[in-house]
Amino acid sequence: MINFGIVDNENAQQVYYLLKSIKKNCKFDYTITLMECSKNNPIKNVIDGVKKYTCKYEDANKILREKITENLCILNPNILIKKDFRIEDVSEPFIFGENCYFLPRTDEFKEYKKTLDLPVEIWDGESNYIDWLYKHEHDWKFYYEDFIVSMTTWHKRIHDNATYEALESFVNQKCDYNYKVMIVLAEEEFGKELPVKMKDFVESHKDKVEILWTYKDTRPLKKLDPTIEKYPECPIVTLDDDDILDENDLQKLYIQHMEDPWSVYGSMIDNCYGIEHFDYVCKWVANCRIWPPHCLYNFPLSDFYEYFGGILDDNFNAVRCLYKMTPVKEIKNIQSHKKNDSEIKLTYEYADTDWPNLYSNFIMQHLEELPPDLLYE
């Protein structure tokens, strides 16, 4: 039996993912002690999904101040447990690396005269098991992305300098969190053949950038949906191929997500048209946006073409949030800059589309699916 200790440092989403990975991949007896550090106890009191895990809850200050009655395998919430991780009960305490260390019982800890500050060196004379764990670290843990940045482009823009200026602003952020940039391209358009310029960019940023191929060209919708399918449990930031970010924008956006991980946030927000006799409003966001996991209602792709002209992805996503009762809010301290005339082009497309009637027709055709207790703040 091993007792995992997880310290919640006000990043509820990371702790949630770590708990899920333990449940999925640890095929041995274990217990979990969750130590709350933050004032509002977000894991215990807010995230319902964690309640299905059997955890003991402790105040972090209390457990470190008072006597520790059992060994704890403290895990860094920035990692996940992978594979069928096998572990044996360990009698002697140890500390190693910055991702996993043992917090020993108080009586044992006095013998070692070690601090709990990280990082620390491996203790001399560790057991064979500890040696194995250290050498095979890659077999049982891996880092995960805190969020994914997803964008798409098309054949008339993939060669533009503006596209690569935007991409450089995505990868060169000052951000304390792990993220990856996903460039979604359609096989229908490119046939899995990357232009030389894009191939060179991906190669020069291969630790940060990945190409995601999807067969069908769903135009602007493919900046989000294929990435959601590949990373269903990860928050996703969507950007356009001409968005130029300030160096701290992604950090600001993700911090806002951590404070309110159940809402969609965007740097521009507006109200869609209301429907007569219905007391609600549908909100849509544009520009720099972050989408939490499971925030969109699953409407068929055909609805995007029939009711939204195959171009109004922001509006389609708005009704998908509406039917999932996902709050949609504005983040005010981010303002991405457009590098070309895409906003003008989209404004004309929007003006030429009979959006009010399309929206009204969509709602009337999906009344049975409309949540009865629909509320927006």
Language-model regions: role of each:
Residues K113-I148, T152-T153, R157-A166, F304-E377:
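C-terminal catalytic/acceptor-binding lobe
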Residues N61-N71, L224-P235:
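Active-site nucleotide-sugar/metal-binding loop of Leloir-type enzymes
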Residues I6-Y16, S38, M151-E165:
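Active-site beta-to-alpha loop of glycosyltransferases that engages the nucleotide-sugar donor
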Residues E36-I43, L185-M198:
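A conserved acidic beta->alpha catalytic loop
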